[in-house]
Amino acid sequence: MIRLVLIYTLLFSTLVSSTGCDKEALAAPETIAEKEYYVSSELIASVPKSMLQSLAKTEGFGAYVNEVKYGVSVYKLQYFTTYQNKEIKASGLVVVPQNMTTPAPVVSAQHGTIFSQRDAPSNFTSLTGFELFAANGYIMLMPDYIGFGASKDIFHPYYDQKHSALAVVDMIKAARKFYKEKNVLANDQLFLVGYSEGGYVTLAAQKEIETNPLHGLKVTASAAGAGGYDLTAMLAGITSGATYTYPAYLAYVLQAYNYTNSWHRPLLEYFQEPYASRMPQLFDGNHSGSAINRQLTTDPEELFAPAFFAALKEANEELTLKQALQANSFQDWVPKSPTRLYHGTSDNIVPYSNSKITYDRFISQGAKYTELIPIKGGTHSNSFVPMLQSLVPWMKAF
């Protein structure tokens, strides 16, 4: 993951010359909303330009060394957001270029699925690579998501549209107060980018911003890769009888919905033994996805409780779950901002067809600035870099 983040950062380095120097700085007066969302910030690292250049070299991206223009300051940001209609504290990582005199564009980057608390961005146990993003003149925001960092006592609301969106949007708003406090100049550009779960979270945040003008935000452009945007279609694939190579995702969704919606169903209603008894320990925040997978099975019929699995196949059973999956799919909204959906055509974790279905729905409902970009032969693990390579020239136009 760290290597992917580094690639993510470096590939955007050429954008700064066209997006960072000629935009109007945000100079709006502080609002009540900003005061309410912002909690605190803590400087956790200061990385000089020379170290970032060395990092680029050691990771095999020597060609980008000259694009490292600034050292960076890395902050942990705490802010208020909402979970189950109650105010909670959340956290994320903010990386800003040092001594930059021109207003910088803001990029909110939504990370892919994580299981371990150690992987929360704001823990910053080592250089992540996103420091290089800021070294090229971007203000980098990366929310931990609810369930990680400051909100680690909550079970992560995985693939829940409302909570995914608010974790991003509230951090963006809280960051405005942070900019003023630290004398950071931000221009009026806001990019949203994410892959896998981050792709889903990106669209959730975009939808929230575009449908709720009270946030006072405007998306410049959005790019989402390989997210499970149509959860009902994902369910159909799971019940088809085919194996699923990453069962940790399936267990994650069911438990997240059970917690987030306060259904309080026993795990034995969802999973067979020995898997049901393993779930609390496997999802305690100390295990990686790979470690969880090794303790589960790739056969959904063996993973799920027989009665539950049979009910999933019936149109009039497990309606509460199915309705929740439908409500958290993107079936009642059309992107207004320029939007790209990227997806590898050989993805066996989140099928390419999921993005195609979502794209076709957007177009049929009147989307004017949405594109579907297939990555031919790409899998879930290797389509991230081609996505970013394609994004560079596209984003230069804004």
Predicted regions and their residues:
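Catalytic-loop region of hydrolases
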Residues: 23-101
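Accessory cap/linker subdomain of secreted extracellular hydrolases
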Residues: 30, 225-332
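Short, surface-exposed "cap/lid" segments of acyl-processing enzymes
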Residues: 84-91, 95-132
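Gly/Ser-rich "nucleophile elbow"/oxyanion-hole loop immediately N-terminal to the catalytic nucleophile
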Residues: 96-99, 103, 174-193, 214-217
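Alpha/beta-hydrolase active-site loop
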Residues: 158-181
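Short alpha-helix in the alpha/beta-hydrolase fold that links the catalytic acid
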Residues: 205, 337-339, 351-361
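Short beta-strand/loop motif that positions the catalytic acidic residue
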Residues: 340-347
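Histidine-bearing beta->alpha loop at or near hydrolase active sites
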Residues: 346, 367-392
